[in-house]
Amino acid sequence: MYKILLIPEAVKDYKDLDGSVKISVNKKIDELKSNPFLGELLGNKFNIDLSGFYKIYVHGKKFRIVYRLLNPENIEIIEIWGIGKREKEEIYRKIGKRIKEKLGNNKIT
């Protein structure tokens, strides 16, 4: 089993979800604990560099969980950076902003 860590912004994303979406997210996070490669590797999405991040579809593909693997060579921690709607690239724009704020040009992939 791998450890799941949510950055503070992702905790807020989670708290803002309604009950049925939270249930779907919880199930997917439980699956992720045993398989860090469950998601699809992201690259450049809508001119946002998300290299090194993965996405998982949740709740009928209406929502995404975006995460990365800390130390991909020896995975112990899966770090969730956001949970949100895909519509109008909302979640990807949030993650792009968070990357700039937290990592700047020092993004670890």
Positions of PLM-derived features:
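Active-site micro-motifs of SAM-dependent methyltransferase domains
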Residues: 12, 31, 85-88
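Secondary-structure boundary motif
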Residues: 16-19, 34, 72
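Short histidine-centered beta-strand/loop micro-motifs
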Residues: 14, 57-58
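Arg/Lys-rich, positively charged N-terminal/basic patches that mediate binding to nucleic acids
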Residues: 1-28, 107-109
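Broad gene-expression machinery/nucleic-acid interaction feature
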Residues: 1, 53, 62-64
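A short, surface-exposed loop/turn module that caps and links secondary-structure elements
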Residues: 31-57
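A general secondary-structure junction signal
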Residues: 8, 44-46, 60, 84
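Enriched for short, Lys/Arg-rich terminal
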Residues: 58-64, 68-109
